[in-house]
Amino acid sequence: MGSGSSRSGRIPRRRRSPDRRQTGPGETASEGGTADQAPTAAGQEESGRDPRPATPSGGREETLRLLDQLLAESEAWGPQELTPRGPARLAPAVSPEKKVKGNPEDSCASEAPGNSPKRPEGQSAISYDYSEEELMASIEREYCR
């Protein structure tokens, strides 16, 4: 399976502007362009916008500088300023099936070693959504038949 991303790591090609075309040996780049370039320039002036992305000279260096600055600032933020991505989940409700100790369906489900009601200090409780708990119980019932 793929990662789910529709974008690949390819960089889109940029078209060269007519005035930045490479010159051959013995040629010199003309400042005014050629006659076949004139209608294109006139069409751009009439439409009022340039279809090419406006990239100032040294734009790559400026972008890299800004990214470095942002990275340095984000490292200074630290974890105390991070915002949670979603609401905290409540502890799961215990289903009636799990309350019964002598349930034969639970016999095939292995318990994780070291599970105890007491947690060492510094560890946070992992909470699960009730629907996830029910799904796991139904999967256990299905495969323990």
Swiss-Prot record:
The keyword Repeat does not apply. It is a lipid-anchor. The keyword Methyltransferase does not apply. It comes from the Eukaryota. Keywords: Cell membrane, Cell projection, Cilium, Cytoplasm, Cytoskeleton, Lipoprotein, Membrane, Myristate, Phosphoprotein. The modification Phosphoserine is found at S116. Residues 1-129 are annotated as: Disordered. A lipid is attached at G2 (N-myristoyl glycine). One of its GO terms (cellular component) is ciliary membrane. It is found in: Cell projection, Cilium membrane; Cytoplasm, Cytoskeleton, Cilium axoneme. A motif (Ciliary targeting motif) lies at residues 29-33. One of its GO terms (biological process) is positive regulation of transcription by RNA polymerase II. GO terms for molecular function: chromatin binding; transcription corepressor activity. Expressed primarily in the kidney and liver. Expressed at lower levels in the lung, brain and heart. It is linked to Defects in Cys1 are a cause of polycystic kidney disease. Interacts (when myristoylated) with UNC119 and UNC119B; interaction is required for localization to cilium. This is Cystin-1. It comes from Mus musculus.
